[in-house]
Design a protein with these regions (language model features):
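Extracytoplasmic beta-strand/coil segments of soluble accessory domains associated
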Residues: 61-78, 94-136
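Short, acidic, small-residue-rich periplasmic hinge/interaction motif at the N-terminus
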Residues: 30-86, 297
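Face-selective signature of the C-terminal outer-membrane beta-barrel domain
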Residues: 257-271, 284-410, 419-423, 476, ...
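Outer-membrane beta-barrel signature, preferentially recognizing the C-terminal barrel domain
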Residues: 280-289, 293-297, 327, 427, ...
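Conserved C-terminal beta-signal and adjacent last beta-strands/turns
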Residues: 212-214, 257, 430, 468, ...
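Periplasmic-side early beta-strands and strand-to-turn transitions of outer-membrane beta-barrels
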Residues: 168-169, 181, 189-190, 196-198, ...
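Short acidic/polar hinge/loop motifs at secondary-structure boundaries
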Residues: 136-164
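Gram-negative outer-membrane beta-barrel transporters
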Residues: 388-390, 394-395, 488-491, 512-593
Length: 655
């Protein structure tokens, strides 16, 4: 891991900040008047109790596609709340995801991120399913996420539910090692004007404008626009990497409470951006989406929901010769879901879905997707029954997802989960799950160069990667301390490989399923209220990935493309409420080295200082990567980028 002395020093700094702020004579206990002292004490106590309760009793929906208490979930789930995001100083969704200790998050350059759960990390990671309000943000090119265009306004996020481990039984293929579900606020919670903006050394300039209003007594809406400019990162030699970029996005949401039992929501976004690259024209990215959701409570024991969305993405990527790789993706998705309680012991959720993706690529001589245009369909159905063997004590969930895709046909992904409430403060859970990662276009239809003879070609017989996962977890609350432990072991079959066609000749290579593997480890998190004003949260992850070739495989990659993950990581977050409406937050992380990329381990510290002169105005200063002038987080030399220390200021006004 990062140098032990650096870790110890930074950890001591975070703790010392809290001790000084809370224990200095008169600092935390001397409000301006007796009235202020009484109001502040009550407010802090309420906040403390709510936070501890929320950790165990917060309602989540990502584990079983229905509302349930966090303490009752048989899954390794962490929740990033709106307050966590606000106090973190994060300026983008990937930065906010660093708050989840069960994720591996690495910044690659000014706009690219490598994000995964339980290993297999890369900028094209393909074993993590990401949703925004139920809309899958997914590219058929590599079964992953273009993180740089997932620019959800952070002030509009209600919470982010992060599951590490399989979620395929309910969410389908590619929810192999985790699910990230971003849930935004109802329009009724974003009424009035909000203006936010600022700038600094790396995040050069940014701004958000939002307005929420009402149409009658039952319809609420909001509209927003935002944009930013980011500075370039450094190359390993210290020179500018020419990867600065500019981005804007606008959108809306309408929530209509049709009656006490029926609700309808309509929302959408449009975006456009330009990304610099050395020795070539800028990369252009654009897209948009629109989504309709409807829900109806049929009775106290029956609830129906449906959604329909359309999503378009476009990327124009020039190369140094002036050729353009032009990519258009159009996604149409519809899903119907029904939840019903059957008798006193069964809570059943079932659903049907359909997805159509039209993908068109304008190829170049350097690389091509053949055929250039494809239309792929997915048909899905799922069912899960939660059985109360002993009410309020012992619950078992059994379910499966059945999915048909145009590449591999029918895929079945079952799971079984057990949740045992040992006492009101202690829970044990266990799970066994099967998940698959279905082929993407890069697995079957990618060719480099674009014309024969090819050095690298997609495998026409590439089949789904398979996982069988075993999990065991523990949760406990004692007073002001909450603990969570999740352990896991997974076996993988048919992992992606690069097969030599004519060994020992290094080329050509064909993408195949020539590798198997395993991963195992543990994820630990803790939250502790030291005082009414000072909260600490900490986490530690131990992870091992082992990958090996199958008998007869001529794989040339040796698993290197599947294992860019540190063995261990540690984080410590401190949040302190000071007098005079001042808040101080410090977030420390220590990340182990990535051996096969020669990325050294590192320790870093982010901090945010906020003053609220009035209830409607926030003034903040944020420091990022404060321990080093620059450092690397991901990538191989000599093309690796280094992330620089940054400072920026923020003004937020609500009226």
């Amino acid at each position: 891991m990062a140098d032990t002395r650096a870790v110890a020093a930074a950890t001591s700094l975070v703790l010392t900040l809290g001790v000084v702020c809370c224990a200095a004579p008169g600092l935390a206990q001397q409000p301006d008047s007796a009235v202020q002292r009484r109001d502040t004490s009550v407010s802090a106590e309420v906040l403390k109790q709510l936070s501890i309760e929320q950790l165990m009793n917060l309602e989540v929906t990502s584990v079983s596609k229905r509302a349930e208490r966090l303490s009752q979930t048989a899954s390794a789930i962490q929740v990033i709340t709106r307050e966590d995001i606000r106090r973190s100083g994060a300026s983008s969704l990937p930065e906010a995801l660093r708050l989840a200790g069960n994720l591996q998050v690495a910044q690659v350059d000014s706009r690219q991120w490598a994000i995964s759960a339980r290993g297999f990390n890369s900028t094209t990671a393909n074993k993590l399913l990401v949703l925004i309000d139920g809309r899958t943000v997914y590219t058929p090119l590599f079964s992953g996420v273009f993180w740089e265009v997932q620019e959800v306004p952070l002030v509009d996020i209600d919470r982010i539910e992060v599951i590490s481990g399989p979620g395929a039984t309910l969410w389908g293929a590619n929810a192999v090692n985790g699910v990230i579900n971003v849930i935004t606020k109802n329009a009724k919670d974003t009424q009035g004007f909000l203006l936010s903006g600022g700038g600094g050394t790396e995040l050069r300039g940014f701004g958000t404008a939002r307005y929420g209003g009402a149409l009658g007594s039952s319809v609420r809406y909001r509209i927003y626009g935002r944009g930013f400019a980011r500075d370039e990162t450094d190359s390993s030699s210290g020179q500018g990497a020419t990867d600065d970029w500019h981005f804007w996005q606008g959108g809306f949401r309408v929530d209509w409470d049709q009656s006490t039992t029926s609700r309808f929501a309509l929302q959408g976004d449009l975006y456009d951006g330009r990304i610099a690259q050395p020795n070539a024209d800028d990369v252009a990215v654009s897209g948009g989406n629109v989504m309709a959701k409807w829900s109806r409570t049929i009775s106290e024991t029956s609830h129906l929901t449906a959604h329909l969305y359309y999503d378009r993405t476009h990327r124009d990527i020039p190369d140094t010769s002036g050729e353009h790789l032009d990519i258009f993706d159009d996604t149409y998705d519809v899903e119907l879901q029904h939840q019903a309680r059957l008798g006193a012991r069964h809570d059943v959720v079932w659903g049907l879905g359909y997805r159509l993706i039209n993908d068109h690529v304008g190829n170049t001589p350097a690389l091509a997707f053949l055929p250039a245009h494809v239309a792929r369909q997915w048909f899905t159905g799922f069912v899960q029954d939660e059985i109360a063997l002993v009410r309020e004590r012992l619950h078992v969930s059994l379910g499966t997802k059945v999915e048909h895709n145009d590449y591999t046909g029918v895929e079945i992904q079952p799971s079984g989960r057990v949740n045992w409430t040992v006492s009101p403060s202690t829970t044990l859970w266990a799970a066994v799950s099967r998940a698959v990662r279905t082929p993407s276009r890069i697995d079957r239809e990618f060719f480099a160069p674009g014309q024969p003879p090819h050095l690298l070609a997609g495998g026409p017989n590439f089949h789904s990667e398979e996982e069988l996962a075993y999990e065991l977890g523990y949760r406990h609350q004692h007073g002001d301390l909450a603990l969570s432990v999740a352990t896991f072991y997974s076996r993988y079959h048919g992992l992606r490989s690069l097969e030599r066609v004519n060994p020992p000749a290094p080329f050509p290579l064909v993408i195949g399923n020539g590798q198997d593997g395993e991963s195992f480890g543990a994820e630990l998190t803790a939250e502790y209220w030291v005082t009414q004003r000072w909260r600490l949260s900490a986490g530690y992850t131990e992870l091992r990935n082992h990958i090996w070739p199958n008998p007869g495989s001529t794989d040339a990659s040796r698993g290197s493309a599947e294992s860019h993950t540190p063995d261990r990581q540690f984080f410590l977050h401190s949040s302190v409420d000071l007098p005079a409406r001042v808040r101080l937050d410090a977030r420390f992380r220590a990340i182990d080295d990535i051996a096969n990329q020669q990325v050294p381990g590192y320790a870093e510290l982010n901090a945010r200082l906020t003053w609220q002169p009035t209830s409607k105005l926030d003034l903040s200063v944020v420091g990022q990567s404060l321990l080093h002038r620059r450092h690397a987080e991901f990538g191989t030399p000599p093309t690796r980028r280094e992330i620089e220390r940054g400072v920026y200021g923020v003004v937020e006004w609500r009226f």
